[in-house]
Regions:
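Conserved acetyl-CoA-binding loop of GNAT-fold acetyltransferases
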Residues: 24-31, 88-90
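Conserved short beta-strand elements that form part of the metal-binding/catalytic scaffold
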Residues: 29-62, 113-119
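Short, conserved charged micro-motifs
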Residues: 17, 77-81
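Conserved active-site tyrosine of GNAT-family acetyltransferases
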Residues: 18-25, 84, 111
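Exposed loop/turn and edge beta-strand positions of beta-sandwich/beta-sheet ligand-binding modules
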Residues: 4, 34, 66, 100
């Protein structure tokens, strides 16, 4: 009956700019736009809906209540890290290696927390 998450929505003061950021920096494709809302799709089919926000929001902190980060899976951590670095992305720390998994936190155009990850093996 329940098949999983179809998409996740992010409210942005500038939905178009944020959709374009995901396309330019993370290879998402802007595949649908209506009335100022944008759907962007990752290579694995994951979708984000970017909707207009009413006003600005202070950048989230790691331990605030609510959704804290979106994890972006990569198959070449070093290449992805270099790509983001060359694009001037704001990193929220240094790359880490935890239990064989390589990870790095960074921020999108609006300051939302993203998590780059290359797993040694898939989650169970």
């Amino acid at each position: 009956m329940f098949r999983g998450l179809e998409h996740t929505a992010i409210a942005s003061p500038d939905p178009r700019a944020l959709a374009e950021w995901y396309a330019a920096h993370l290879d998402f494709i802007i595949n649908y736009e209506y009335a100022g809302n944008y759907f962007v799709r990752a290579a694995n089919g994951t979708m984000l809906e970017i909707i207009p926000a009413k006003g600005a929001l202070a950048p989230p902190q790691f331990d605030d209540a609510g959704i804290r980060h979106l994890a972006i899976e990569v198959d070449d951590f070093d290449a992805a890290h270099e790509h983001l670095k060359a694009a001037g992305v704001r990193f929220l720390g240094e790359p880490m290696n935890k239990q064989g998994n390589r990870l790095l936190f960074f921020a999108d155009h609006d300051g939302n927390i993203l998590h780059l990850i290359q797993r040694e093996r898939p989650l169970p």
